[in-house]
Amino acid sequence: MRILLSNDDGYFAPGLAALAEALAPLAEVTVVAPERDRSGASNSLTLDRPLMLRQAPSGFYYVNGTPTDCVHLAVTGMLDHLPDMVISGINHGANMGDDTIYSGTVAAATEGYLLGIPSIAVSLANHNALYFDTAARVVSDLVRRLQNNPPTEPTLLNVNVPDRAWDAVRGISVTRLGKRHKAESVVKTSNPRGQTVYWVGAAGAAQDAGEGTDFHAVANGYVSITPLQMDLTRFSQMESVTAWLKP
């Protein structure tokens, strides 16, 4: 099996190294990740300048672009084979509910999915994450399962792991995405030169976090696995919008 790894925290991130080490006994692993932290880059592609691919002493490749750039470049321009799987992570912090829209971690996996490759995004639900070994073990188990029972169609899984020791994880739960309250307002401040600058506000707290959601599973010590899709069509409004457009 051949696996392409990426992330949005950068090629130097501990979560990426932990995942690469855990998967090495299971597959031929190639790492292509951003040269710096690109958290929140979502599915953006770099179109205004060329991309450069370099190799670090660790053997990991890094790109002066976004997580989506990394996977797109690797699959369509670097590798001489199509990976059997694309895995993105381990992210430092959760990607649940609305986070998935903004997440570079999820975006890297999404690009693999759009290129027809089974893909997994994995996040450790704590920005000061400690138990990367737990998340790596979860992903290794998923890879073995997918090896033994390959999906019949391209699959995109969003995995969130509680930041705790393996023995303290209560199990795995297949979930739907929850929802957050709206984000906090931007923070207005000044830089050392007295110029007004703004920082994007914090993400909103969980709003829809009931049983069956990713928020609920992780809060209760379970690994959350949410199958994702790309069709954003709101089918329930098609008739009402059609009626609204009639003269």
Swiss-Prot record:
Its EC number is 3.1.3.5. It holds the Pfam family SurE. Binds 1 divalent metal cation per subunit. Its cofactor is a divalent metal cation. Its main location: cytoplasm. The keyword Manganese does not apply. It is an enzyme of class 3 (hydrolase). InterPro entries: SurE, SurE-like_Pase/nucleotidase, SurE-like_sf. A divalent metal cation binds at residues 8-9, 39, 91. GO terms for cellular component: cytoplasm. Keywords: Cytoplasm, Hydrolase, Metal-binding, Nucleotide-binding. It is found in: Cytoplasm. It comes from the Bacteria. One of its GO terms (molecular function) is nucleotide binding. It catalyses: a ribonucleoside 5'-phosphate + H2O = a ribonucleoside + phosphate. Belongs to the SurE nucleotidase family. Nucleotidase that shows phosphatase activity on nucleoside 5'-monophosphates. This is 5'-nucleotidase SurE. It comes from Thiobacillus denitrificans (strain ATCC 25259 / T1). The lineage of its organism: Bacteria, Pseudomonadati, Pseudomonadota, Betaproteobacteria, Nitrosomonadales. The gene is surE.
